[in-house]
Structure formats: C-alpha cells, structure tokens
C-alpha cells in the first residue's frame, strides 16, 4: 500500500498527493507523529484529510500512512463506566501511559482493556447453526448490565468450536464458525465502522414512553423509546442541566453522554456526580450503566464529528443486545460549526450562514439511526436507541440553520426560553412553542399502567396553559379585574399547573426525580381543583372566594412535589380529601 506525501496544511485540513487507490473515509496517519485523520475528499491522486488531532509542527513532504480501513471502534465488555475522547481512546489509560493530564498527539491506546479477564458463560453449543446477531454467551460486565456477546453481522454458518465457561480476555477466540469451509473466529470484542449503521430486522413504531422523571418532559412533551428530541436554547437557559437530568434519571438500560464541543467543566460535573448518585430504577450507582465521550471545546474541532458517530455506534451495539439505550449529545451545534470550519478550509460552496449545503443530510443520517427495532439474530429481542441532542443557536434565534434543519428530523421539540430561565422557572421549557409527536402513541401506555384519565388530565392542562397565554394579553391592557369569573379561574389553574407541576428543582433530593405515579397524583389534584371550581363558578361563586376558602391547601399542593417522596404517595390521599372537603362545603353554601 503506497504512502502519500503532505503538500498543504490548513489547520485541521491536510492535503496529500500520491494517494492513488485511496478510499473515501479511509483512516490515515499523518506526518511523523502519525496523527489520526480521515479522507473526506479525493481529487485525482490528491486526498483531502481532516485530522482529528492538533496539526501544529507537521510540515509539507512528511509522509501520510494509509491503513486501508474506515474509522472503526471496538465494541465489547469494558465499555461501561469509561470515559473516552472523541476517537474512543480511554482517558484513564492515556493518563497512565503518559503520566500527564494532557492527551499526547498520535497516541494509540486500545479502547477496550486487553488484560482484563471476563467471565464468559456460553449459551450455544457445538454444531448449532449461527447467523449474525445471535447471542452466543453472556458476560456480567456490571451489576446492572449483562453484556450479551453477539456474532458479528457478517458471520454465518455452523458453530465448529466454543469454549467452556471461564475467564477470557477480549482477544481470546471464544468460538469458531465454519462459513462454507472458511473458519471465522469470534472474540468477546468486535470492530464496527462508525459511519455505517448497524443492521436490524425491522423498525417498529415507538409506543412506550422513555420515562425521564422530569414532569414537563414526561407529561406535556413525552418522548418514546426509540424517539428523537432536540433541546435548543440560548446561553444560560439550562440545556446542560436538563440533559444531565435526562442522563441521570431516564429509564434507559444504557446511557451514552457525548460532550461535543462544550466546556470541560460539564464533563467534570458528570464524573464527579455519577459515581455517588443512585439509579432510581435499580438503586445502583449511575456509572454502572453510563458511558461518557468527552470531546470538549479545547480539543481539536474535527474530532467533534467523530465523537457523535462513536456515540451513536456504541448505542446501536447495546440496542442489538436487546437494550433500551439513550444517547445524549451536547451539543450538535458545535458539530455543525466544525463542518462549517472544514467546509470553508476545503473551499466548498457555503449555504445559509456559511454552513455546508450537506448539513441537512448529515443531521438526517444521525437522527435516522435512532428508533425501536426488532434486532437480527436469535433469540428474538427488541431494542431501541433514543437520541436527545442540545442545539445552541446564537442569541436564541431558532430560525438559524442548525435549529431549523434539526426541527425537520426530530419528533420532540423542547425549546428553552431565556425569559423563563431569568424568572427562575426551571426546566425553562416553553410550553407554547414545544411539541411532541409521540403523545398519541404513548397515551395508551399511561392510561393502562398509571392512570386511566391521564390523557384527559394532560389535555386539560395544555388547554389551560394556551388559554392563559391568550388572556395574558388582555390582562396587560385592562387588568385582571375586568375578566369574566371563568377566565379568572383559568389564570388561577394555570398558576397552579406552573408552580406545582411544571417547575422542578434538578438539585433537590426529592423533586429531581418524579415517578410516573407521583406525576399522575399531582395532575389529579390540579384536575380535581379545576373541575370542581369550574362547577362552582358556573353557579355564581367568585374565583377569589374559592381560592380564599382553600387557605393553605394550594401552597401545600405546590410544596408537595418536594415534600412527598415517590414511595409515600398515600400522603396525596390526605391532600385529595382536604380538597374535596373544601369544595363540598362551598357547594353546601351555594345550595342554601
């Protein structure tokens, strides 16, 4: 394989000649330090290479070494609980090797530890017919994750050999498959190119909600397992805290958090918090189900693209094992900015605001890899990849290209409003601008498993919030006293919805996570208040009298979100009784 020669260097872009027969997206090693790069354009025998490491110090005429392989990652036991850079190099291994807190250029470290022995339990026997995606055995990687060892998608045939139960490294052959005379060894680890989606048998409609413990996300704008969501918002509106809440409390089996071009402090927060936090669904440390990919703002720009693909490929791998995985990316705007930077250096024709014309297709490729699927292989199983990505529009302008193009491909939109954030209303998700295309799909699950009136209660809350916004314009002009009594009740109910339900403290031990049952109980209190109060208003009782009769009950309902734990829901029975008693007394007064 012939090596190339550097002819031009422009930041992270290197042009090399003598690259005849090179392939698009082939990985190459650039210069004497052997920096990792990827071919993104070929013109004759010239290759345009985006380099994933700092190119300072390399010179024209230095060699470019071809590898003949696309950018691939290692998939196997040892991924959970690790923190990788954008090229899937484990940061702890780099620190041990270099004895430095900085990543040395050109360093090569195996993604999966070669020395650790894993206890393998075989699930198939010699002579079995094997095809890609079959589970041939399991490794208990963490107390939370049973790592299912899969046959690589391109392998099929008869199982010629399989090892006995025991301890093996990821490089030890654990099985041999006879593929029409050719022998294919299977190891605990396999490699997969990051730009190629992993195969599946069938894509299914997402019908089960991905519970997040955040009330506004679960109830007002729910996301389904296998869904796609975007969280756009200006600086300081709470994107990172919302995404961290998703990563901490979501009912996903595996969470992959990609810090793409954001501040390093945010990844440090994750590393500091996750080992001490308990997963509310299992009671185990959160790090036992989490993989972190750190590609922070001070790391090379080009590697941002790689980090997004590395994250989604790992998510697909765990999906193929039959798990529900969540990929959290913060933020895709930084990836788009990297594409713009490289497009400018390659002298491509810019589109809107300087972004490349292929930005929509790149975003579409990324979001298309989400979904709930029936996997290939035996036994039959179902898995999902849910994608939630932050978008950082400059100045909060949602019409800029990255936000507007992202909106074409996602089914859930959680827009963050800086005016809500300034009013200390968190999560600062604007309930008038947001939407979810999954409400109809997940309503049946909520009605069956949580509360048969869930859809009715949710729709009442949404209608009230929309009507309150219409009335707010009138109140600004003529004041609240001129409103009809039923409209005054709308304002009071909307205040209760916002204070008792939509506001949530991500740093409060009790309020940070609301179980579906707790959410339904709070909704039920608001629904009862609105239903009974509407009846009384129709009978001529003023809204002010109803609110005054409540005394301290409404503040008690508002405080209940941070006072009543998820396993103490019987305390809501007492609040419900008090509420009904107040209305019964008012009805007696109205009847006399």
From Swiss-Prot:
It is an enzyme of class 7 (translocase). It holds the Pfam family ATP-synt_ab_Xtn. Keywords: ATP synthesis, ATP-binding, Cell membrane, Hydrogen ion transport, Ion transport, Membrane, Nucleotide-binding, Translocase, Transport. InterPro entries: AAA+_ATPase, ATP-synt_VA_C, ATP-synth_a_Xtn, ATP_synth_asu-like_sf, ATP_synth_asu_arc, ATPase_F1/V1/A1_a/bsu_N, ATPase_F1/V1/A1_a/bsu_N_sf, ATPase_F1/V1/A1_a/bsu_nucl-bd. GO terms for molecular function: ATP binding; ATP hydrolysis activity; proton-transporting ATP synthase activity, rotational mechanism; proton-transporting ATPase activity, rotational mechanism. The keyword Ion transport applies. It catalyses: ATP + H2O + 4 H(+)(in) = ADP + phosphate + 5 H(+)(out). GO terms for cellular component: plasma membrane; proton-transporting two-sector ATPase complex, catalytic domain. ATP binds at residues 233-240. Its EC number is 7.1.2.2. It is a peripheral membrane protein. GO terms for biological process: proton motive force-driven plasma membrane ATP synthesis. Has multiple subunits with at least A(3), B(3), C, D, E, F, H, I and proteolipid K(x). Belongs to the ATPase alpha/beta chains family. This is A-type ATP synthase subunit A. It comes from Saccharolobus islandicus (strain Y.G.57.14 / Yellowstone #1). The gene is atpA.
């Amino acid at each position: 394989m012939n090596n190339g020669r550097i002819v031009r260097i422009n930041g992270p872009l290197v042009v090399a000649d003598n690259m005849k027969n090179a392939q698009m997206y082939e990985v190459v090693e650039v210069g004497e330090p052997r920096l990792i790069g990827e071919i993104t354009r070929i013109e004759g025998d010239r290759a345009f290479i985006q380099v994933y490491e700092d190119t300072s110090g390399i010179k024209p005429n230095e060699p470019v070494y071809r590898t003949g392989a696309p950018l691939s990652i290692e998939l196997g036991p040892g991924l959970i609980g690790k923190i990788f850079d954008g090229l899937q190099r484990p940061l702890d291994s780099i620190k041990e090797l270099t004895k430095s807190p900085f990543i040395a250029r050109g360093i090569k470290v195996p993604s999966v530890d070669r020395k650790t022995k894993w206890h393998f339990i075989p699930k198939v026997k010699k002579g079995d017919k094997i095809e890609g995606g079959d589970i041939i055995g399991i490794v208990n990687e963490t107390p939370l994750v049973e790592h299912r060892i899969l046959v690589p998608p391109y392998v099929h045939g008869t199982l010629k050999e399989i090892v006995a139960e025991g301890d093996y490294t990821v490089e030890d052959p654990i099985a041999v498959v006879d593929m029409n005379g050719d022998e294919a060894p299977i190891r605990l680890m396999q490699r997969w190119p990051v730009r190629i989606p992993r195969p599946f048998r069938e894509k299914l409609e997402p019908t089960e909600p991905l519970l997040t413990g955040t009330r506004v996300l679960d109830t007002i704008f729910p996301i389904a397992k296998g869904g796609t969501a975007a969280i756009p918002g200006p600086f300081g509106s709470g994107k990172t805290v919302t995404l961290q809440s998703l990563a901490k409390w979501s009912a996903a089996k595996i969470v992959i958090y990609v810090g793409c071009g954001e501040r390093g402090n945010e990844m440090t927060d994750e590393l500091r918090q996750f080992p001490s936090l308990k997963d509310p669904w299992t009671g185990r440390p959160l790090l036992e189900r989490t993989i972190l990919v750190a590609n922070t703002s001070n790391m090379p720009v080009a590697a941002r693209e790689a980090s997004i693909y590395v994250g989604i490929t790992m998510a697909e791998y765990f999906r193929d094992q039959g798990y529900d995985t969540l990929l959290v990316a913060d933020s895709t705007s930084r990836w788009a900015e990297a594409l713009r930077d490289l497009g400018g250096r390659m002298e491509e024709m810019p589109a809107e605001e300087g972004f490349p014309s292929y930005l929509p297709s790149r975003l579409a490729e990324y979001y298309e890899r989400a979904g709930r699927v029936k996997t290939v292989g035996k036994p039959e199983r179902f898995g999902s990849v849910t994608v939630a990505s932050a978008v950082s529009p400059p100045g909060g302008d949602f019409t800029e290209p990255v936000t507007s193009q992202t909106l074409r491909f996602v089914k859930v939109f959680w827009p963050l409003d800086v005016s809500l954030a300034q009013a200390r209303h968190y999560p600062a998700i604007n309930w008038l601008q947001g939407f979810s295309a999954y409400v109809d799909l997940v309503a049946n699950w909520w009605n069956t498993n949580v509360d048969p009136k869930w859809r009715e209660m949710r729709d009442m809350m949404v209608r009230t919030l929309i009507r309150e916004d219409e009335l707010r314009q009138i109140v600004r002009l003529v004041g609240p006293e001129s409103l009809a009594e039923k409209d005054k009740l709308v304002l009071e109910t909307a205040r209760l919805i916002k204070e008792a339900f939509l506001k949530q403290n991500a740093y409060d031990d009790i309020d940070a996570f609301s179980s579906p049952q707790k959410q339904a109980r709070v909704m039920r209190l608001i629904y009862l208040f609105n239903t009974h109060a509407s009846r009384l208003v129709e009978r001529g009782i003023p809204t002010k009298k109803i609110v005054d009769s409540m005394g301290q009950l409404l503040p008690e309902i508002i405080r209940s979100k941070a006072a009543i734990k998820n396993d103490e829901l019987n305390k809501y029975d007492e609040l419900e009784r008090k509420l009904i008693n107040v209305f019964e007394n008012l009805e007696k007064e109205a009847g006399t």
